């Protein structure tokens, strides 16, 4: 389609043609014919560099010129906002005004009301929606760039909520990379869909292996064996190359290595221009490496560089001065293997995106995608005491601790046994097998680790009141169920009620009409008395029916429709489908967990007490593997050890029952647990030995054997968000940036290391990297090459070149993001009650994709209870929400409610002892802060620092065994960085001392600045003490500028930062008054102070002062080298 044929304003055509564009690309033409120019929503999913931005510009400008109003262009990153702002400024020739906004989440930015095109990050626009900026009602179009990030764990929920808010209020144009389910996104947005793989530059894709380049069309080119030859070949052709690697250090190392080779291909003018570029970069440890690489026309690009440095590199690459950039882009199980998830154990082959699995940290993380491949050959069967055997591929890694048993004898005859531990470390299953078989020392054992989740659910009741109706043979009627009016609003959670629920899990069932039944033995009078007494206590209006049956069976029944529904929805129905909900399993109240365990044991357990010679034990049998794994975690959360045994019992010839899972507690745990649960405790026997024990926050499982087994079929793995591990009864590994085009893209790595090992990079990411190949206007063809170092080239071609990208999945259920969004809906968007909240959630992508919001509703209820309990919101007598000042301000400040709660809880301690270190550790402890990691060799130093500063902290130091211990030391390290910063420690020394890059420090300071501001704003709500408030304000100013207290007055002056302020202070200019009294020529003697700085200060202070020619500094004369340079 020709530009002249477009049904748009002629002025727009003129601007486009001035860019040299006379004809549109095919996908652009298809997009503009889709109805988007008439106001219809559109999802445009096409490759990088195929013209998505031009489509959005045409739609935006045409709509604004014809209808008025405003257009908002959403981007994921601040750097992209700046880039788009510069691009869109061109439209100001048509009278449109363009603005960009990315920071300061505590503002309505009313000044944006004067602008027509507003570029914003998603987070910034979300904050503007919360503040209720008056100009938002005028927004006629929202463009969501990179909308595929709706599947991002960290940022996806924000983007999804924005689009849900704006659906029906403004036209939506969603720009996306090619994804696996774009049609699903289009359906949700009620949008036309244009999907295309057309590119303006032909893309050749291939895999390089040991000097052979296998193209996707079957052709083979030959090069020297090292992949670097691909880079040099591109430069020799007068082209540029992008090299993607998997770590920052690799990017730096490869850039320096390539520099010495590429430098020989540069011209002398290029060398001189590179020297000028190098001289403009500030010195620090990271840029020292960058300068070494730049000498040869090569640069590295990663998040450790400052924004200014990244921009400088990108501009020099676009201009052709930099030839090469190395950059970082931002194994398997048998199908019947059970993985521990938040809702119980599930087969790895049955897991789906969004399931939450237990990771090595003891927390549950989202599954991004399940992975599957064919396998023919060996599997290793790992058998460990305390868990069921697991079948695993030999190269799959497991987390292992080496345990060494020691024995000491004393003169009085006493014998003490103790253990030493080495690790943990990752090793392949094959390596573990070889170590196990070669180990000759009987004192050495190899232990697998099962994390013990920290109880994290703070709930003391179960909500019961709800409108439920009678169900008859024709379905639901409008007749309210009679039990509802007599149902208590909540069922308290305590030892008694948890015990009752435990009994129901073991021996209970429900009917659709609300009958709750317990099946017990007819000789269990004490149990009958407990069940009936507890029902009478908490359901006083319920009719209880006790009936004996043959074979010594007894049923206890009562009716409560709401409680029955809660049991079915949260626990399940049927012996093999039941699981323990997190509300109980992870409840912070130990009494709740103890009551639950007692009820389970009473219902379906067995306590062996009669033997003195043989080991006694507590046993629980179930056909539900999910329940078995959860029971082991429940026992472990109480500080005891247990084991799981699986057996298959047969009856008759050829008849096989389902596997039975027995969870056993024996040894010392047996006696202690019986006593704590309130059972009769027998006399201790001679045998209390147990091979398993707890260590730190893990259950240690001793490996007893590893056997081989032949297998042919599919094997599975998981990609986990923010982690590289998951639990199958013990921890296994899941073995599973830059926006510039270049002629040749080389992908050195298709795996990356995160936390504890390697994982395959998703297809979508690799294909986006490949999409950078080929520069429109400059190249007729682009080349994208994957390097196969140890991988099979054919498999890489099948996966990454011919494979389809992954599907997008809603990340709204991410608890941290969802918590903040629920608060915002209530306090800022006028959601009046829970029904309205559910109604809004039903319009989200999550609801559209899953067709059901029940799990989201359950989470929302938990969050609402949390918000009420912590005084963010309240409810009136009609169950309508009331937004409280604390909640409204928290939402406006754009921080997690958990962060706000931490601040509020700390206010009394801050008033007693305001100090920088305690406040900085508080900031670092919040979920909104990016904290540093304390490496193993540093842990002792930071623990010593914590004890030294203990009286200044606002929280206690966790024990070594506590799962929070390592994270706490990271918080201490982060607080120490901030303390050094405000004490004017030079940046270079901070980078070196803490082994961080400038980009890391910038990110920490930016977040700390915002959190410090939020702390002050929230403190104002709670009758603040003026002296404490002033202290916090001064500390905030010190944090923002990185200065000691004596420089506060100076840094308030324009363009006076930490270095210039210190230079002025040391030169004797210690206050504004000193500066006003000084002569300009004296100020000009201070390092870093120039004429423009002085003039700016005078203007700021309202002083009219003209600097004479004599007072102006004389220009320094240069030499010949300066002139030539």
Curated annotation (Swiss-Prot):
- Helicase C-terminal domain ranges (all copies): 226-440
Where is each Helicase ATP-binding domain found?
A: 33-197
Question: What does UniProt say on post-translational modification here?
Answer: This protein undergoes a protein self splicing that involves a post-translational excision of the intervening region (intein) followed by peptide ligation.
Repressor recorded as keyword: no
Stated role: DNA-dependent ATPase and 3'-5' DNA helicase that may be involved in repair of stalled replication forks.
Q: How does it assemble?
A: Monomer.
* EC number(s) recorded for this UniProt protein: 5.6.2.4, 3.1.-.-
Q: Which residues bind ATP?
A: 28, 46-53
- Nucleotide-binding as a keyword of this entry, yes or no, is yes
According to the lineage, what is the superkingdom?
Archaea
Its UniProt entry gives the catalysed reaction(s) as: Couples ATP hydrolysis with the unwinding of duplex DNA by translocating in the 3'-5' direction; ATP + H2O = ADP + phosphate + H(+)
Q: Identify the InterPro entries for this entry.
A: DEAD/DEAH_box_helicase_dom, Hel308-like_dom4, Hel308_SKI2-like, Helicase_ATP-bd, Helicase_Hel308, Hint_dom_C, Hint_dom_sf, Hlx-hairpin-Hlx_DNA-bd_motif
Q: Name one Pfam family in it.
A: Helicase_dom4_arc
Q: Residue numbers of motif DEAH box?
A: 145-148
What's one GO MF term for it?
Answer: ATP hydrolysis activity
Instruction: Name it.
Output: ATP-dependent DNA helicase Hel308
Organism lineage reads as: Archaea, Methanobacteriati, Methanobacteriota, Thermococci, Thermococcales
Enumerate the spans annotated as DOD-type homing endonuclease domain: 500-640
- Motif placement: Q motif: 1-29
Alphabetic keyword roster: ATP-binding, Autocatalytic cleavage, DNA damage, DNA repair, DNA-binding, Endonuclease, Helicase, Hydrolase, Intron homing, Isomerase, Nuclease, Nucleotide-binding, Protein splicing
Which family, according to UniProt?
Answer: Belongs to the helicase family. Hel308 subfamily.
């Amino acid at each position: 389609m020709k530009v002249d044929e477009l049904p748009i304003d002629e002025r727009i055509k003129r601007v486009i043609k001035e860019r040299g564009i006379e004809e549109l690309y095919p996908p652009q033409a298809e997009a503009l014919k889709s109805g988007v120019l008439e106001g219809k929503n559109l999802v445009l999913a096409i490759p990088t560099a195929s013209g998505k931005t031009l489509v959005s510009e045409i739609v935006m400008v045409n709509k604004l010129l014809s209808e008025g109003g405003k257009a908002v262009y959403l981007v994921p990153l601040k750097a992209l906002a700046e880039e788009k702002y510069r691009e869109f400024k061109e439209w100001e020739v048509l009278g449109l005004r363009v603005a960009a906004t990315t920071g300061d989440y505590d503002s309505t930015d009313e000044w944006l009301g004067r602008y027509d095109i507003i570029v914003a990050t998603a987070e910034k626009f979300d904050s503007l929606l919360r503040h209720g900026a008056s100009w938002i009602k005028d927004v006629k179009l929202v463009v969501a760039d990179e909308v595929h990030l709706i599947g991002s764990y960290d940022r996806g929920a924000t983007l999804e909520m924005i689009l849900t808010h704006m659906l029906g209020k403004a036209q939506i144009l969603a720009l996306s990379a090619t994804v696996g389910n774009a049609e699903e996104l289009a359906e949700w947005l009620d949008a036309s869909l244009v999907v295309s793989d057309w590119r303006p530059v032909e893309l050749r894709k291939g895999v390089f292996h040991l000097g052979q380049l296998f193209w996707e069309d079957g052709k083979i080119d030959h090069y020297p064996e090292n992949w670097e030859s691909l880079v040099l070949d591109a430069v020799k052709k007068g082209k540029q190359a992008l090299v993607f690697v998997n770590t920052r250090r690799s990017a730096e190392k490869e850039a320096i290595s390539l520099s010495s080779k590429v430098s020989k291909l540069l011209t002398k003018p290029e060398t001189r221009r590179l020297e000028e570029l190098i001289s403009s970069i500030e010195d620090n440890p990271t840029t020292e490496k960058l300068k070494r690489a730049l000498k040869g026309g090569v640069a590295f690009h990663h998040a450790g560089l400052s924004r200014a440095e990244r921009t400088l590199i990108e501009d020099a690459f676009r201009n052709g001065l930099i030839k090469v950039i190395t950059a970082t882009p931002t194994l398997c199980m048998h199908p019947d293997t059970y993985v521990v998830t938040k809702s119980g154990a599930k087969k790895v082959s049955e897991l789906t995106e969004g399931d939450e699995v237990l990771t090595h940290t003891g927390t549950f993380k989202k599954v991004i995608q399940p992975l599957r491949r064919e396998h023919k050959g060996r599997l290793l069967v790992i058998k460990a005491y305390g868990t069921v055997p697991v079948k695993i591929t030999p190269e799959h890694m497991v987390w292992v601790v080496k345990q060494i048993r020691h024995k000491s004898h004393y003169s009085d005859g006493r014998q003490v046994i103790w253990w030493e531990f080495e690790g943990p470390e990752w090793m392949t299953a094959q390596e573990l097998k070889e170590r196990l078989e070669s180990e000759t020392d009987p004192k050495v054992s190899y232990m697998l680790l099962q994390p013990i989740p920290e109880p994290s659910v703070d709930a003391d009741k179960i909500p019961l009141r709800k409108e439920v109706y009678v169900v008859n043979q024709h379905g639901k009627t409008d007749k309210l169920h009679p039990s509802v009016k007599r149902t208590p609003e909540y069922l308290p959670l305590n030892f008694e009620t948890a015990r009752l629920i435990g009994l129901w899990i073991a021996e209970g069932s429900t009917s659709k009409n609300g009958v709750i039944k317990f099946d017990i033995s007819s000789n269990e009078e004490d149990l009958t008395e407990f069940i009936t007494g507890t029902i009478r206590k908490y359901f006083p209006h319920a009719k209880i029916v006790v009936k004996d049956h043959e074979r010594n069976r007894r049923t206890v029944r009562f009716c409560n429709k709401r409680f029955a529904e809660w049991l079915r929805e949260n626990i399940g129905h049927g012996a093999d489908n039941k699981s323990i909900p997190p509300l109980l399993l992870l409840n912070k109240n130990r009494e709740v967990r103890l009551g639950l365990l007692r009820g389970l044991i009473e219902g379906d357990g067995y306590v062996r007490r009669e033997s003195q010679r043989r080991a006694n034990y507590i046993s629980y049998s179930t056909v539900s593997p999910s329940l078995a794994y959860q029971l082991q975690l429940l026992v472990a959360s109480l500080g005891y050890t247990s084991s799981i045994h699986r057996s298959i019992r047969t009856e008759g010839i050829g008849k096989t029952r389902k596997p039975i899972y027995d969870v056993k507690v024996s040894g010392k745990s047996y006696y202690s647990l019986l006593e704590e649960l309130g059972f009769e405790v027998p006399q201790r026997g001679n045998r209390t030995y147990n091979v398993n024990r707890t260590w730190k926050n893990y259950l240690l499982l001793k490996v007893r054997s590893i056997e081989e087994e032949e297998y042919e079929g599919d094997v599975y793995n998981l990609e986990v968000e923010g982690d590289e591990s998951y639990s199958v009864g013990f921890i296994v590994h899941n073995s599973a940036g830059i926006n510039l085009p270049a002629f040749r893209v080389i992908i050195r790595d298709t795996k990356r290391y995160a936390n504890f090992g390697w994982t395959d990079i998703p297809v979508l990411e690799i294909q986006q990297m490949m999409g950078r190949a080929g520069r429109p206007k400059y190249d007729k063809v682009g080349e994208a090459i994957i390097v196969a170092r140890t991988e099979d080239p054919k498999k890489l071609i099948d996966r990454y070149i011919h494979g389809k990208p992954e599907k997008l999945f809603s990340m709204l259920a991410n608890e941290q993001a969802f918590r903040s969004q629920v608060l915002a809906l209530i306090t800022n968007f006028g959601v009046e009650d829970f029904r309205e909240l559910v109604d809004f959630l039903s319009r989200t992508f999550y609801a559209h994709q899953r067709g059901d919001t029940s799990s989201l509703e359950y989470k929302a209820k938990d969050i609402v209870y949390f918000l009420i309990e912590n005084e963010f919101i309240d409810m009136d007598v009609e169950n309508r929400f009331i937004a409280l000042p604390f909640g409204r301000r928290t939402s406006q400040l754009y921080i997690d409610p958990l962060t706000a709660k931490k601040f509020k809880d700390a206010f009394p301690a801050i008033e007693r002892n305001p100090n920088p270190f305690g406040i900085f550790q508080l900031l670092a402890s919040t979920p909104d802060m990016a904290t540093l990691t304390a490496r193993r060799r540093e842990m002792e130093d930071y623990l010593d620092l914590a004890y030294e500063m203990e009286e200044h902290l606002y929280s206690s130091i966790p024990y070594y065994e506590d799962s929070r211990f390592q994270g706490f030391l990271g918080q201490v390290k982060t607080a120490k960085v901030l303390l050094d910063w405000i004490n004017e420690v030079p940046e270079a020394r901070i980078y070196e001392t803490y082994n961080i890059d400038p980009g890391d420090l910038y990110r920490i300071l930016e977040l700390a600045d915002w959190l410090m501001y939020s702390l002050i704003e929230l403190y104002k709500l709670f009758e603040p003490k003026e002296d404490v408030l002033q202290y916090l304000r001064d500390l905030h100013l010190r944090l923002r500028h990185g200065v000691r207290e004596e420089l506060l007055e100076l840094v308030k002056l324009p363009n006076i930062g930490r270095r210039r302020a210190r230079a002025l202070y040391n030169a004797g200019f210690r206050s504004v008054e000193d500066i006003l009294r000084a002569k300009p020529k004296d100020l000009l003697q201070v390092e870093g102070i120039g004429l423009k700085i002085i003039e700016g200060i005078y203007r700021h202070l309202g002083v009219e002062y003209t600097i004479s020619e004599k007072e102006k500094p004389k220009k320094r004369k240069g030499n010949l080298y300066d002139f030539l340079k």
